[in-house]
């Protein structure tokens, strides 16, 4: 499911093993790609840093899959569990969306009114998991890593660079965490005064460092974990736990595997759909 109540456009581009994206020419034509994200939590991805920030190179948000209809038991990730309430919410929403498409103006007005009533009946989106806004989202990370591969390896003529990290486009990451966001990110976060700036030359490596600094477990964040496992067109070169973090703050120096779960890292609040899942314990205990 994409960004609009008409899912026809999205499903036309993502079907039968085909995945198409509409990408800004500037991102492909540039000699060096520079990414300048804020450091925030994210309802669909856990965190939004460099890898998630590449949604910005897209030219039409309705080409981007955000979640898959249903529950994990149905092969979806819209809701965690299949209940009569989630069934009723999904069925009612689908009916209203079709009405909005069939009756422009009237249908759209009805949909807006129904959303207000639905909030009372099914719960506020800032407290109730829906639309893939939880740690079981298995769609958004895939879309984001596709975009990263396109920017790293895509050529203006539609072909790709050799599938070797050494051939990827030069890339610089500067993460603004001076005032970031925690809790219900990305749109309604609480301020996070981490007062840090992270930088590096690989988006997955910098995102891994950001996750550890935030006090989270990389193995529980698919968008970061899977970036280190990407095949075909690699995004990262090594095991994330061996990446060295170098900081002017001595307690933050060391391999990410050793720093994960350290009390020296920040203690931050995840999005409510990720609370109790994403937080790190000491990495050596986690591995054991």
Which ranges hold each PLM region?
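Extended, low-polarity segments enriched in aliphatic/aromatic residues
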Residues: 1-288
